[in-house]
Structures are given as structure tokens and as C-alpha cells.
Design a protein with these regions (language model features):
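N-terminal secretory targeting signals
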Residues: 1-59, 176, 180-184
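Bacterial extracytoplasmic/cell-wall-associated proteins, especially those involved in peptidoglycan
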Residues: 43-184
Length: 184
């Protein structure tokens, strides 16, 4: 029954997107105004970092982000999923990380769910994200960020990374089972 409901959500999502007459790309502008996400003249999502450098986000990036959000937070509340999506965008905007979504996600040891360039969940590659994961990614692109610009997160109960446990943290937020933070 859950599989049927999931398939119905995915089919609905993929049925609605083309009807919006979108050319596969969206726009997000950080700041006081959010641009129309469905303006058909837009060629990519422009996510701006502090130095006004743009990070362009394609449909493939949105799918990849949704896969990671699902694999890292499938048992978390909506705000936890949004927080994971926000960390990906925050890293792309911050110094010291790759400047693209795929670069951030595929950076070595960045996300425990990424193995050999594939997003893995419970040992199975090619994760298919659920609609809640897509919603979280799109909300993050609209500027929602419950982490207040965190670039790291971990689950203290299951984490095997001593670095995550020992590092001096700033801006700590606990959302669901994860701890989100910046490094001091």
C-alpha cells in the first residue's frame, strides 16, 4: 500500500511539472524577495552566496538533492528534511566547499549515503526520493533554512565520526535526530 501511495505521489509530481510549462529550471534569489520559481524564461536556479556569485541549480541537481535528503532523513520530520537540503545549499554558498550542488554532494566523505558516486539507502543504490524530499528541496531553494546557515550535521546516536563529535561547534541546532552546526 505504501509503494502504491509513493508511486501516486511521484506520478502526480511528474504530471504537474510539465503542465506548468517550465523548461526544467527555476530561480531563487536570497534576500528580501523571492523570484518566481516557475518563470519559463529562466534557464537555471541562481542561488546567490555572500559575494553575489551565483550557483546554478538544474533539474538534475534537484533530483540529486532529493535523493540525499531522502537517504539522510527519510525518518525525520519535514523540518529535518528541510534542514538537510539547507546544509547542501549552505555548503555550495560557503567557502571551503565545491561551488556546485553535485560537487558538494559528491565531495569525498561529505555525506554517508554517497558511495562511489551513487546515493545509497539501506544498501540499495539509486535511491528514489519521495515527494516530501522534493518539497524540502524546493523549500530550501525558496530560502527556508531552519539551521541558520549550518554546513554540517550528524546523528549523535549512530555517528561513527569522532571528528563530528569532538569539533568545537557554533550555531548548534537539534532538529529531529540530527545536530546541525557550523565549525568555530
Amino acid at each position: 500500500m505504501k509503494k502504491l501511495a509513493f508511486l501516486a505521489c511521484i506520478l502526480t509530481l511528474f504530471t504537474l511539472l510539465p503542465s506548468l510549462n517550465v523548461k526544467g529550471e527555476y530561480l531563487y534569489s536570497q534576500g528580501s524577495e523571492i523570484k518566481d520559481l516557475y518563470n519559463e524564461k529562466i534557464e537555471a536556479v541562481a542561488v546567490f552566496n555572500g559575494s553575489n556569485d551565483s550557483i546554478y541549480v538544474t533539474d538534475e541537481d534537484i533530483y540529486l538533492m532529493s535523493q540525499v535528503v531522502y537517504a539522510e532523513s527519510c525518518g525525520e520530520p519535514a523540518n529535518g528534511k528541510l534542514a538537510v537540503a539547507s546544509v547542501i545549499l549552505n555548503r555550495a554558498r560557503a567557502g571551503g566547499f565545491p561551488k556546485s550542488i553535485s560537487g558538494v554532494i559528491n565531495q569525498k566523505n561529505a555525506f554517508s549515503c554517497v558511495k562511489g558516486g551513487k546515493v545509497v539507502h539501506k544498501g540499495k543504490p539509486d535511491v528514489i526520493p519521495d515527494s516530501a524530499s522534493y518539497v524540502a528541496v524546493l523549500d530550501a531553494l525558496k530560502g527556508k533554512d531552519p539551521t541558520d546557515k549550518a554546513v554540517f550535521f550528524y546523528n549523535p546516536v549512530i555517528s561513527t565520526s569522532q571528528w563530528m563529535k569532538d569539533i568545537k561547534k557554533a550555531n548548534i541546532k537539534t532538529i529531529g535526530n540530527h545536530v546541525f552546526f557550523l565549525v568555530k
